[in-house]
Regions:
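Hydrophobic faces of well-ordered beta-strands that scaffold small-molecule active sites
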Residues: 2-8, 40-42, 63-69, 85-89, ...
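Active-site beta-loop-alpha junctions enriched in small/polar residues
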Residues: 7-13, 45-47, 68-74, 92-94, ...
């Protein structure tokens, strides 16, 4: 059964233009956990404010804390000092924020984190078996498979082909004892489609969670997504 991870990045982005309570993740932490979420994530940066105080976050929630980090050594080192549970390397210059491997610079970043006790390292990849195998050889703790492409298909055949590519990659990862997460423009329909064919460690949801909560309320939306993720 997958765990539910709430990606707070869209909420933080909303906070730049409004002071609504829903735009401040600190207001939502204990509430998010109470409705069944097991993880939270956000991208490291000055605009995240108090979210960078992981000690404070731990006093407010038992959720796994996943900090998304750009492929930059200085930024990674700063994020590591916060001592989250896991850091996920992402390429913020790419539309789907995936990294590409093999890459000498990515390997150097991974090696920086690998031997740190009680800190996991993840990378965000396209659903590509070759890159997955590269990640395995690097000793990565967890792979987040980008599902963005799935959201862009509105016709059945390309949708099913994309879904097959994603599930095949995830199957290979699980077979090799890799922890696999999935995220990227996921809504309830896409989560149901994934859950019908594959099991992952975490399912990360952000934009769809925010947009639906603005219409139907955060509590109802969180419960709704948690139920969809929880159904196997």
């Amino acid at each position: 059964m997958p765990y539910f991870e709430v990606n707070f990045d869209p909420f933080i982005a909303l906070g730049k233009i409004t002071n609504s309570p829903v735009s401040n993740p600190l207001n939502l932490l204990s509430f998010v956990e109470s409705v069944g979420a097991a993880g939270i994530s956000f991208t490291y940066g000055p605009e995240t404010g108090q979210m960078n105080n992981v000690t404070l976050l731990r006093s407010m929630t038992n959720c796994r804390i996943n900090i998304r980090v750009p492929v930059d050594m200085q930024v990674l080192q700063k994020a590591v000092l916060l001592r989250p549970d896991i850091v996920t390397l992402c390429d913020m210059e790419r539309e789907d924020t995936t990294v590409q491997i093999p890459s000498k610079s990515i390997k150097e970043l991974v090696d920086t984190v690998l031997n740190i006790e009680d800190l996991g390292i993840a990378i965000r990849l396209k659903p590509d078996v070759k890159q997955l195998k590269e990640a395995y050889q690097m000793g990565i703790d967890e792979i987040e498979i980008a599902t963005n492409e799935l959201a862009h298909h509105d016709k059945q055949t390309p949708f099913l082909e994309c879904l097959e590519k994603i599930t095949h990659t995830i199957h290979i990862g699980i077979k090799n004892n890799l922890r696999i997460a999935a995220g990227g423009e996921l809504d309830r329909r896409l989560i149901r489609a994934l859950n019908e064919v594959i099991d992952v460690e975490f399912i990360s949801v952000g934009k769809a969670l925010l947009s639906r909560s603005l219409m139907w309320g955060l509590e109802n939306t969180l419960k709704e997504f948690n139920e969809v993720i929880d159904i196997r």
